Regions:
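Soluble extracytoplasmic regions of secretory-pathway and membrane proteins
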Residues: 4, 10-881, 885-898
């Protein structure tokens, strides 16, 4: 028996040591990392706050609840003439509850810090005249404190009652008496002792419970501004006239009941407890019933009249919360008087029309520019650069390392963490240029990167979208750099990123942290070795500043001969009064919010991993609060280098939220808003023959009334249940007008074609339909790209690219035709230039229902396409066998056929 006890003690001790070492390794591993990147103050501030809150919460909760229980136990034992027992069980319950309370309080570190560092919004709510900052910063803190106290007092009352009853029952059982809970029993029942001896202490605890409840209910009054019972989100007629006064009454009644319990300490009548709780419950029920009756019998029959002012509150606050109040509305008077001269004068717009859709282009990149199976293009992004003196919109994608694609026999620890450590270079092409083979014309391509316009001195990508695992650099093992024909080129990391593994202690820490004994025993590691982790740029930035929400689409930038990532960061809350909430699936991990600002731009060096946070919206009170919480973390946007600030984009996810809300909230008149008389929707388009909602797109164009082209994001709108255009929204990205929102509305008296109406016209064109059918019959898939609506002067040009790709997997999409629609003219040509020439210069584009369709594709071309598809399949089979020589020969033959 003794040996078993010793064994258990040893096992428990070993388990405790393991847990402590694991936690310590995690803490020290993170601390070294924060020291390396220079944000240790953020880490230590958060950790310190969490520890203080956790310990304070635990000590207060345990001390009060356990103390009350011990007093109750002593009271019971004293009245029965027996010493108190069962303290271990009471202590265990108190410890468990206190641990949960401490952890919950520790998790609320951000609420506490934001309260003490808060910056006012300078705007008040329309009901209580409180600054919005009260709801965003103060109310959550007060609610946290009161919820903690309310939970503490309730638990203390329950634990004390259990402790008292336990003592009474133990004494009775030991005395041989069967305990009775009959209140009317004459032989000293349990309840008799309970109410006679424990009632004074219970009265005090219930006094504290109801005082805390009264304060909590008083705060709850402000929560009616988030009500959804009326015509809109926010307090409505019923909330103001029923819920608010009932909640106020409940708060006062709870306070009176609490005082009653305190007075009952002298009266000592158990009926006071029962009647008080019953009265409180009765008022709650009456309030609920009254609210339902008023809403259904009073409000709903005359809803607009009674809810009008609250509708107005909702409209204004929603526009403010989503930064839509500053959207400038203009009338866009459409005319169709464009000439060839107008097209030439708007050359910068025309030459930046995005013919390449990122989805087929990604497949093209993979076929032409991966070179090895362990590389990956995770995404293709849109940006703009000055190229040879011209402002050009481009598509760009980094070539990242994907160690998961290594052959199974190569999936070793050395290969995964020491050899294949980084990606290499980027691929870039202009959005409008297509080769004669239907392929992109590259600005940057190949390994090492070659370009007539750009110099990339450091093309290596150690930090990216796909860098999920850690890497160890400066080891005795050669680090793969890039392939060069049949040979591999190797390198040694020369950057500043990573934690130095300069001692056995650090190696042990990270071996535990990453559950990797190789970090401790590998002979490849040297005193100069560096451990690079948190290399995924989205996770890296969130690790440093978890209080921000991050966009799902980081994008890479070529600047000053290096590669950088730019990530949009948001400040959000769901506590803005009267603002309509939305579910933002692509922001953070998916958030419900009713306020958002794109206040921060984050830059990550792809080689060193350096992270910089720049405030782009200093008027945002939330980011100003964070700046107070963590001084030194943020820089002003004016401190961002021009080579990077020239690539800032208005984020798509933010724009989508704003555009979706604006379809309803452009109706600022409460009656029009209530009836949804002028509701808009985001239109649909065809992509791969499937109908889908149109997505916002970037474009370089000259806005109405402006002299120069600029980089904007735009999205059209159509009326609800109709297909014609009603307007479009634009967000500007260039300095100094970054962030400006413009909304252009079309005349409601004239028809302006929407995307699906243009798609219908294309489908009805016999020549286009004939070509698409022939392509499909030749074994190719026809991919219809995005329908782009291009405003030029006061006209609209519709452009849709067509791609061909083989039906099999691993295709090489080629841009084969461009469809242009203008007014009543429609044409499909091999290039955009040809299509514009047909419509504007020759003036002989095929009108809808025209009698002279273009000649179909020749049989020779069809045979050539079929041969290309066959060769491509053979090339893929050779690649899967690892026969790179045969793979190259097949592609050489494909090249000959394409050129022929």
């Amino acid at each position: 028996m003794k040996s078993d006890t010793i064994t258990r003690i040893v096992l428990v001790g070993l388990l405790a040591v393991f847990v402590i070492f694991t936690l310590l390794a995690g803490f020290l591993g993170d601390l070294y990392w924060f020291l390396e990147i220079g944000y240790e103050d953020v880490f230590l501030s958060i950790i310190t706050t969490r520890i203080i809150l956790g310990i304070a919460g635990f000590v207060v909760f345990f001390g009060f609840s356990y103390g009350c229980a011990i007093i109750a136990a002593r009271t019971a034992s004293g009245s029965l003439g027996r010493p108190a027992g069962g303290r271990q069980g009471i202590a265990a319950l108190a410890l468990f509850a206190s641990l949960i309370a401490g952890l919950n309080l520790s998790a609320a570190w951000e609420t506490v810090l934001r309260f003490f560092a808060q910056v006012p919004f300078g705007v008040s709510d329309p009901i209580f005249s409180q600054d919005i900052g009260f709801y965003v910063f103060s109310l959550p803190f007060y609610s946290l404190v009161l919820s903690f106290l309310l939970g503490l007092f309730i638990f203390a009352a329950i634990l004390s009652a259990l402790a008292f009853l336990f003592q009474v029952l133990v004494v009775r059982v030991r005395g041989g008496q069967f305990p009775t809970f009959d209140i009317e029993a004459e032989t000293e029942p349990v309840w008799g002792v309970f109410f006679s001896e424990f009632l004074p202490q219970l009265n005090i605890l219930l006094f504290l419970v109801f005082v805390a409840l009264a304060a909590r209910l008083w705060l709850f009054r402000y929560s009616i501004l988030y009500s959804s019972t009326g015509a809109v989100f926010g307090a409505g007629y019923t909330d103001i006239h029923i819920t608010l006064p009932v909640t106020t009454i409940l708060s006062v009644v709870a306070l009176i009941i609490g005082i009653g319990f305190l007075l009952n300490e002298k009266i000592q009548r158990k009926e006071v407890i029962i009647y008080s709780i019953a009265a409180f419950a009765g008022i709650v029920i009456i309030g609920i019933v009254a609210a339902l009756l008023v809403q259904s019998l009073v409000v709903e029959p005359d809803e607009f009249t009674l809810e009008k002012q609250y509708l107005d509150y909702n409209i204004q606050n929603t526009l403010d919360a989503y930064d839509l109040s500053r959207a400038e509305e203009e009338i866009f008077q459409v005319n169709y008087t464009l000439t060839a001269e107008d097209i030439r004068e708007n050359r910068a717009t025309v030459e930046n029309i995005r013919l390449w859709d990122w989805r087929p282009l990604k497949s093209t990149y993979e076929q032409l520019q991966l070179f090895r199976t362990y590389y990956q293009f995770y995404d293709v992004d849109v940006d703009r650069y000055m190229v040879d003196g011209m402002y050009k919109q481009v598509l760009i994608s980094p070539r990242e390392m994907d160690i998961g694609s290594l052959p199974s026999q190569a999936q070793t620890w050395v290969n995964q963490h020491l050899v294949y450590t980084h990606g290499y270079g980027v691929v870039m092409n202009p959005v409008d240029v297509v080769t004669t083979e239907g392929l992109p014309a590259f600005y940057i391509k190949d390994i090492p990167p070659t370009s007539p316009y750009f110099t990339i001195d450091e093309p290596r990508i150690y930090y990216g979208e796909g860098a999920a695992s850690y890497a160890v650099t400066r080891t005795s093992t050669d680090e793969f750099d890039y392939p060069a024909g049949d040979q591999n080129i190797y390198t040694d990391y020369d950057g500043t990123g990573g934690v130095a593994l300069d001692g056995i202690v650090k190696k042990l820490i990270y071996a535990i942290k990453f559950n990797s004994v190789e970090l401790l025993v590998s002979g490849s590691l040297t005193p100069d070795s560096r451990l690079l982790f948190n290399r995924n740029v989205a996770e890296r930035t969130a690790q440093i500043a978890p209080f921000l929400s991050y966009d799902a689409d980081p994008y890479i930038v070529v600047a000053d001969g290096r590669l950088y990532w730019i990530i949009d960061a948001y400040t959000t809350t769901d506590a803005y009064p009267y603002s309509e909430p939305v579910m933002a699936w692509n922001i953070g991990s998916g958030e419900r919010l009713n306020y958002i600002r794109n206040s921060v731009k984050v830059v990550v060096d792809a080689y060193n991993g350096d992270v910089s946070y720049y405030i782009i919206d200093p008027a945002d009170p939330i980011v100003s609060t964070y700046d107070r919480m963590f001084p030194g973390v943020f820089q002003g946007i004016e401190e961002m280098p021009d080579s990077l600030s020239s690539h800032l984009r208005y984020p798509e996810d933010f724009f989508r939220i704003q555009a979706q809300l604006y379809t309803i909230y452009h109706m600022k008149d409460p009656r029009v808003f209530y009836n949804r008389e002028d509701a808009w929707v985001i239109p649909d388009e065809l992509y791969r023959q499937q109908r889908q909602q149109m997505v916002p797109y970037y474009i370089i164009m000259k806005l109405p009334g402006e002299e120069e082209e600029e980089f904007i994001m735009m999205l059209p709108f159509t009326p609800r249940n109709k297909e014609n255009l009603i307007g479009w929204m634009a967000a500007r990205s260039d300095q100094p007008v970054y962030g400006d929102l413009l909304v252009y509305q079309f005349s409601k008296q004239e028809l302006t074609y929407g995307p699906m109406q243009v798609e219908a016209r294309i489908d009805q064109d016999t020549a286009i339909s004939q070509d698409i059918t022939l392509w499909s019959q030749s074994g190719s898939d026809v991919v219809r790209g995005n329908t782009l609506i291009i405003p030029i002067e006061n006209s609209l040009l519709y452009v849709e690219p067509l791609y061909l790709e083989a039906s099999e997997r691993g295709t090489l999409p080629q841009l084969k035709r461009v469809i242009v629609v203008y007014n009543d003219r429609l044409t499909m040509q091999e290039t955009l230039s040809d299509a514009l020439s047909v419509i504007f210069e020759e003036g002989t584009g095929t009108p809808e229902g025209g009698e002279e369709p273009r000649p179909p594709i020749s049989e020779t071309d069809l045979e050539r396409l079929a041969r290309i598809a066959d060769l491509y399949d053979r090339a893929q089979q050779a690649l899967s066998r690892g026969d790179l020589g045969q793979y190259q020969r097949y592609f050489d033959e494909i090249g000959d056929l394409v050129k022929g």
